[in-house]
Amino acid sequence: MDAAEKKKIIEEYATHPGDTGSPDVQVAILTKRIAELTEHLKVHKGDHHSRRGLMLMVGQRRRLLNYIAKNDIEHYRELIARLGLRR
């Protein structure tokens, strides 16, 4: 993911201008990185170092989503619908 893609994601999921660290933004960025790394691992099946990084990212996203769900369940449902998670 290059800087332009990251900036676009930040603008789309920011809760206010200048917001780069809210849980929504973090989850959106992690989702993009997870998708890219998943595609990489489909080609490079033996890349176990990257697989471990993927598992760490999935765990981090899960923790952030748990935090959002605990604080505002409706917001959580909207976010996972926007991201296309939990089909």
Curated annotation (Swiss-Prot):
GO terms for cellular component: cytosolic small ribosomal subunit. CDD domains: Ribosomal_S15p_S13e. Pfam families: Ribosomal_S15. One of its GO terms (biological process) is translation. One of its GO terms (molecular function) is rRNA binding. Keywords: Ribonucleoprotein, Ribosomal protein, RNA-binding, rRNA-binding. InterPro entries: Ribosomal_uS15 (IPR000589), Ribosomal_uS15_bac-type (IPR005290), uS15_NS1_RNA-bd_sf (IPR009068). It comes from the Bacteria. NCBIfam families: S15_bact (TIGR00952). One of the primary rRNA binding proteins, it binds directly to 16S rRNA where it helps nucleate assembly of the platform of the 30S subunit by binding and bridging several RNA helices of the 16S rRNA. Forms an intersubunit bridge (bridge B4) with the 23S rRNA of the 50S subunit in the ribosome. Belongs to the universal ribosomal protein uS15 family. PANTHER family: RIBOSOMAL PROTEIN S15, BACTERIAL AND ORGANELLAR, SMALL RIBOSOMAL SUBUNIT PROTEIN US15M. Part of the 30S ribosomal subunit. Forms a bridge to the 50S subunit in the 70S ribosome, contacting the 23S rRNA. This is Small ribosomal subunit protein uS15. It comes from Cutibacterium acnes (strain DSM 16379 / KPA171202) (Propionibacterium acnes).
